[in-house]
Amino acid sequence: MANALRIVVVGGVAAGPKAAARARRLAPDADVTIVEKDKLLSYAGCGLPYYISGMVKERKDLMATPIGVLRDPEFFANVKDITVLNETEATEIDRSVRELVVRHLPTGATKRLPYDRLIIATGAEPVDPPIPGNDLENVLRLKRVEDADRFRELMTSRTCPMVTIIGGGLIGMEMTEAVTECGSAVTVVEMLPHILTMLDADMAALVEQHMRQVGVKVLSSTRVERIEGDEQGKVKSVVTSAGEFPAQLVLISVGIRPNVELARNAGLI
């Protein structure tokens, strides 16, 4: 529609689609566009551990509505009247002319999207501590569906009987449960005095007691010094301040940091 309000949302996983849908309800005549760097969008990131464990049976269930309709670009176009540009990275906010510069990743083609309102919902990335060996094969992080695909593949292959999880926060605990249900032995390494540091120590102790009862080894107040690999470049053990522990798979889960580069480069923060 000519002279319609132009609303552009950067980020298409969690907050972005919610903001776009809300904008559509508040401004039914607006042009609403979501820009998402990855191919998949509007998926249940909190469900990734349960997809790995098999509780979520199929990949598509992470991206489906309660009635099983896949939330893909066609869904947003046909049901929500929202345009989705996936596999498209927002590279620059040109505030002087109110335009967002984007690049289509498969082709490298760039273009400018004019906006009247710009919503930045770029989410966060896993913190990657400078641990020697963190680039070995089978040293993973959990952020995207593709990460969960790889983790689930390794779990179902039964080639990783011993798994080390670095970090005892919420994601680390959910992944501990998932990996245990897959039948692998888990060692959790936490640098701080107890796991789940958002809880009081006595409450965290109850969780830790349960974990030990189901066979999980918990090492608190323990630093990871390095990750050792074999001749093929695959992880074989984790060396900590409490000793060396064999592992065929390592998850680094020590927190997240917000993706603020786009906003910072635009002088917004």
Predicted segment positions?
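Beta1-alpha1 glycine-rich phosphate/pyrophosphate-binding loop at the start
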Residues: A2-L85, A178-L199
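Glycine-rich Rossmann-fold phosphate-binding loop(s) that bind the pyrophosphate
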Residues: G11-A14, K143-R144, G167-G169
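A Rossmann-like FAD-binding core segment of flavoenzymes
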Residues: D29-T33, L85-P106, L113, E181-I269
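FAD-binding core/adjacent interface of flavoenzyme oxidoreductases
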Residues: A2-V10, L70-M162, S237-E244, L251-V254, ...
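Short, glycine/charged-enriched secondary-structure capping and boundary segments
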Residues: R22-R25, G47-Y51, E99-V101, P132-L136, ...
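Short clusters of hydrophobic/aromatic residues that line enzyme substrate/ligand-binding pockets
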Residues: L48, I52, P129-I131, V139, ...
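Rossmann-like NAD(P)H-binding beta-loop-alpha module
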Residues: E146, R150-L199, M203, V235
